[in-house]
UniProtKB/Swiss-Prot annotation:
This is Protein NRT1/ PTR FAMILY 5.14. It comes from Arabidopsis thaliana. GO terms for cellular component: membrane. The chain crosses the membrane at residues 35-55, 78-98, 104-124, 133-153, 183-203, 209-229, 320-340, 357-377, 401-421, 443-463, 479-499, 526-546. InterPro entries: MFS_trans_sf, NRT1/PTR, POT_fam, PTR2_symporter_CS. Expressed in roots. It is found in: Membrane. Keywords: Membrane, Phosphoprotein, Transmembrane, Transmembrane helix, Transport. GO terms for molecular function: dipeptide transmembrane transporter activity; tripeptide transmembrane transporter activity. Belongs to the major facilitator superfamily. Proton-dependent oligopeptide transporter (POT/PTR) (TC 2.A.17) family. The modification Phosphothreonine is found at T103.
Amino acid sequence: MTTTSEISLQEEYVTDAVDHRGLAARRSNTGRWRAALFIIGVEVAERFAYYGIGSNLISYLTGPLGESTAVAAANVNAWSGIATLLPVLGAFVADAFLGRYRTIIISSLIYVLGLAFLTLSAFLIPNTTEVTSSTSSFLNVLFFFSLYLVAIGQSGHKPCVQAFGADQFDEKDSQEKSDRSSFFNWWYLSLSAGICFAILVVVYIQEEFSWAFGFGIPCVFMVISLVLFVSGRRIYRYSKRRHEEEINPFTRIGRVFFVALKNQRLSSSDLCKVELEANTSPEKQSFFNKALLVPNDSSQGENASKSSDVEDATALIRLIPVWFTTLAYAIPYAQYMTFFTKQGVTMDRTILPGVKIPPASLQVFIGISIVLFVPIYDRVFVPIARLITKEPCGITTLKRIGTGIVLSTITMVIAALVEFKRLETAKEHGLIDQPEATLPMSIWWLIPQYLLLGLADVYTLVGMQEFFYSQVPTELRSIGLALYLSALGVGSLLSSLLISLIDLATGGDAGNSWFNSNLNRAHLDYFYWLLAIVSAVGFFTFLFISKSYIYRRVDRV
């Protein structure tokens, strides 16, 4: 029976966290929003730095570095894909060896070093066109070395900072659990604001003033973010397991697979129970239950796994089908930086007399949509939904993800209709064979698809972050957030593969390719309809899988 003094201690201290001295973390002076705001500020600076170099990277490659458009696009896609997939490795290092806090410090230093070298490479490019081949080779090596150093720094920074921020809220406390759900909303709003600022300010400086200055500003922001992060160390909550347990979580869970596979070959008569608790979760798969057993001729407990380890292994396996279905969102999501922008190039971009908006700048409307809708979702939608569903977060994370997939399907339908309208405009005015001509159709026609994609992000991307964070074992939460990032990376690669196959099947520029270089003869509308179908099929698959999904219990996390 729990005594009054024990209850008082539970209310005063966080069970699974310690402070910077390794002592039990007090609720009153560690964690929660006070600590989370420091960490959110760090992420805003990091996203500002990342998009400060990434959003206009193709212009630098085709400009100062003199690459062709095709080579530059390939280099951008390769860097973007690797930068999105590397966080899985960074999260592994954090969860298995270093812990989140130390991984953030080390990766931030690598990040700053990469940005510093990137600034140096831009500064060394001569203003004249007389560049020797040896100088050109050196500058290219320095630039790409710097660029991939940034990707390595981002790989440890991206998943760990968000996981560390969410760690500041105790999910065993009902109020803090609700605050943690809000944290994911405000986290995404804040980083979107940082991205918007980078697109509007840094890109302008790079184009109008200096590339070295344009790369230097993100470097300064990353230095500031590192100082900010370290300054808050006294109020952070740190994982208790990282301080007290020596067993690598991957070793524990890997052992479950090994023992279960080994025992699978034995008959039931050769096995005896070792540790099968009376309250074992019914959702455990029979395959993993074999890890709780030991051969009769073995010493007591020699090969048995703990029940908690089996639950952790089962939780990871259950995530795989959900991860695959989120690709139905990731593939359409990859289009906004490519074909949405290409559509805008052909349209009337005049916003004021004598003032034209760059097509890529329309991406800012995704951020604007997020910034506007997150407060509405968090302060209006969630309280109303909570009254109806009785869920602390309004709706479950899977329902939130599914809603976003539906919105992305609608986005592709709208994009297809707008593209059909654009092609009809080209036909009506006899501009089909004049790809350089500006069509008498305002670029503002593209705004709805950007705004709707931002709205879909609020549901699906934020939902994915919260879902994968909460459904993995406590020690592997950096891996959980890396899973969400990896889905976007794989979706981008699948999109590239799909485009290549369709282009090959439809004859390329010499035939009637959907992606003809002359966009007025292309059929992006067909492609958008295809993506709408893929997204719709993915949604129904997601619906089927999510209905049978059993959420991981929180009481033992």
